[in-house]
Structures are given as C-alpha cells and as structure tokens.
C-alpha cells in the first residue's frame, strides 16, 4: 500500500504543479479552482475510461485484420490510441462546471491543458506500476518531463 501511495504522489505531483502553473498564467481573470479541479478530474478518470473502452473496441478489428501481432500493436499504439485520447480529453470543456466558466479564448486552452494533465497523471500511474523495477527516481524524472507532451 505504501508503494502505491508513493507511486500515486509521484505520478500526480508534476501534472498538478503544471496545472497550477497554467491556471496562474492568466493575468486578468483566473479560472476558479473548482472548475480547474473538475477538468483535471475529468482527464484523470472519465477521459481515461472512455479512451480505454474506445481503444479496446477499435483494436478488435485491427488485430483481426493483421496477421502480424506486432504490426497491429504498432498501428494501435501510433494511430488509434493517440486519436482516441486526443478526442476524449477536450470533452471536459463541455462539462457544466467548466463550460460556464469559458468566456475568453484562452479559457479553452487552460481547461484543455488541465484535462490533458489529468489524463497524463493517471497514465503516469499506469506506467509507474511497470517501472517499479527501474527505480522511483528514474520514474519521477520521466513523469516530470513526459507530462508536458499531453498538452
């Protein structure tokens, strides 16, 4: 249980720090913390679940179309997964608690980035489960750097 708590903190801390930084970059009308939390939570939970379901459904015909398992896995990892993930993350902008707060152009950018960071945090946790043998320091460095690619 202690390992999971450590992995959770290491996985979520860099994206949370980036989210705070992005929220605070607005000069005039900063977004409310509640809406920021909703967008982050969307990315960390619902977008992940929706992505997993869609990726599984779309991978079935891909695996049956290719005789080579490695080619099918490559197509899913390089084409299907990014497309599905980038489709589910911005849906946070349509949430009631977020949508009412969008009144400037950059608001959409802020909430989109925050939802992406939430997605990144959960994805980091998934990867962390497999990285235990490599050491927590290496994993923390990867999380700190790779969280930004989701924005």
Tell me what each language-model feature is:
Residues 1-149:
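Hydrophobic alpha-helical segments at protein termini of multi-pass membrane proteins
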């Amino acid at each position: 249980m202690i390992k999971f708590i450590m992995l959770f903190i290491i996985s979520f801390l860099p994206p949370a720090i980036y989210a705070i930084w992005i929220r605070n970059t607005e000069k005039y009308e900063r977004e409310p913390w509640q809406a920021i939390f909703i967008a982050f939570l969307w990315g960390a939970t619902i977008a992940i679940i929706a992505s997993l379901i869609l990726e599984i459904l779309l991978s079935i015909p891909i695996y049956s179309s290719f005789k080579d398992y490695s080619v099918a896995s490559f197509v899913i990892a390089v084409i299907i997964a990014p497309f599905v993930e980038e489709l589910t993350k911005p849906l946070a902008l349509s949430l009631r608690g977020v949508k009412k707060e969008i009144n400037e152009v950059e608001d959409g950018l802020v909430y989109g980035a925050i939802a992406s960071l939430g997605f990144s945090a959960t994805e980091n946790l998934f990867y962390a489960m497999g990285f235990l043998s490599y050491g927590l320091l290496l994993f923390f460095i990867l999380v700190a750097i790779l969280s930004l690619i989701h924005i």
